[in-house]
């Protein structure tokens, strides 16, 4: 993985993904030992789209590893306002840094960036396409909660059309197999066909599509809530009509298993009531911490800096 860009998780083997999760666990319990792993390294965060958590998570990850950070937040702060292409920006920035994290509203932008850059590029979200590091955070949370990322019934609820985190998670879980997906959404925000095709292509995975959360919540091991994203709508009336379709509160949680985990990529609007936050099944703030840890694992890996004392799960496979 040294020197490789991560645009989607498809470029990583399942063993490499598992090793990143294992590495994140190691980092969490060895904070002092790894604090100088990336001394002298510089990360560029090129965020053409607004973000708080993802950008701060990438930046904190490098800072906790001993490195430094440069970058911008918002297209209005970039040379794109002068007409500069993504490719030219990446060719320029590659001369300054060791690794780039890029977020862009257009699908495919991260791939364009990775082809232009001479340093590893990590996709921090490109349009409605993919968000690989959020998926790693999701997987790390499942691993922490259940000790596994297979043999689970996973409900995904809300905006399943534009939610890039949903698409990334489904496609990656299909690679590991043995997952039952319950896709909960209004007809206007159903899962795209290419994601359904991915589930159908995996013999050990299955899915059902439903509109009613309450009717299926008792069957779920995981409930992955999403917000209806206003920025993806051209018509505000459509957004307002769909915004409050699904709201998880303590009343609905009473129908769920005591062991169920509630995940959410954040930010939330009103789709999870605040009274759910204190429920032991609420795992979305754990995801935030896990997101930083997996980004620390990924950043140190792609620049080739080894964590002191860390033993890979399968050295030959992981180093490929």
Swiss-Prot record:
SUPFAM superfamilies per the record? Answer: Aspartate/ornithine carbamoyltransferase
Q: Which GO terms describe its biological process?
A: 'de novo' pyrimidine nucleobase biosynthetic process; 'de novo' UMP biosynthetic process; amino acid metabolic process
Q: Which UniProt keywords apply?
A: Pyrimidine biosynthesis, Transferase
Where is carbamoyl phosphate annotated to bind? 53-54, 103, 131, 134, 266-267
Q: List the disulfide bonds.
A: none
Q: Which GO terms describe its molecular function?
A: amino acid binding; aspartate carbamoyltransferase activity
* Biological pathway: Pyrimidine metabolism; UMP biosynthesis via de novo pathway; (S)-dihydroorotate from bicarbonate: step 2/3
**EC id:** 2.1.3.2
Q: What class of enzyme is it?
A: transferase
Q: Which family does it belong to?
A: Belongs to the aspartate/ornithine carbamoyltransferase superfamily. ATCase family.
**Which NCBIfam families did the record assign?**
asp_carb_tr (TIGR00670), PRK00856.1 (NF002032)
Q: What does this protein do?
A: Catalyzes the condensation of carbamoyl phosphate and aspartate to form carbamoyl aspartate and inorganic phosphate, the committed step in the de novo pyrimidine nucleotide biosynthesis pathway.
Task: Name the chain's protein.
Answer: Aspartate carbamoyltransferase catalytic subunit
- Source organism per entry reads Bifidobacterium longum (strain NCC 2705)
């Amino acid at each position: 993985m040294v020197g490789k860009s991560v645009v989607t998780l498809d470029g990583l083997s399942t063993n490499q993904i598992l090793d990143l999760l294992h590495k994140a666990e190691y980092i969490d319990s060895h904070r002092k030992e790894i604090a100088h792993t990336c001394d002298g390294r510089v990360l560029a965060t090129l965020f053409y789209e607004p973000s708080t958590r993802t950008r701060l998570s990438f930046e904190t990850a490098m800072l906790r590893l001993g490195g430094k950070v440069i970058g911008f937040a918002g297209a209005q702060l970039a040379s794109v306002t002068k007409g500069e292409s993504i490719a030219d920006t990446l060719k320029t920035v590659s001369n300054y840094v060791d690794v780039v994290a890029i977020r862009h509203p257009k699908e495919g932008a991260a791939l364009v960036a990775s082809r232009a850059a001479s340093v590893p590029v990590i996709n921090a979200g490109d349009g409605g396409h993919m968000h690989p590091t959020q998926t790693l955070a999701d997987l790390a949370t499942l691993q922490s909660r259940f000790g596994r990322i297979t043999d689970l019934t996973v409900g995904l609820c809300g905006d399943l059309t534009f939610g890039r985190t949903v698409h990334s998670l489904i496609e990656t879980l299909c690679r590991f197999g043995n997952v039952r997906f319950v896709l909960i959404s209004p007809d206007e925000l159903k899962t795209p066909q290419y994601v359904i095709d991915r589930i159908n292509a995996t013999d050990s995975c299955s899915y059902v599509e439903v509109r009613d959360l309450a009717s299926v919540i008792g069957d779920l091991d995981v409930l992955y809530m999403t917000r209806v994203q206003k920025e993806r709508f051209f018509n505000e009336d459509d957004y307002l009509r769909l915004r409050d379709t699904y709201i998880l509160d303590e009343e609905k949680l009473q129908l769920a298993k005591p062991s169920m985990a509630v995940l959410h990529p954040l930010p939330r609007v009103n789709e999870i009531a605040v009274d759910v936050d204190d429920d032991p099944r609420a795992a979305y703030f754990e995801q935030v911490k896990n997101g930083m840890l997996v980004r620390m694992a990924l950043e140190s890996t792609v620049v080739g800096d080894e964590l002191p004392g860390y033993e890979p799960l399968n050295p030959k496979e992981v180093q490929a």
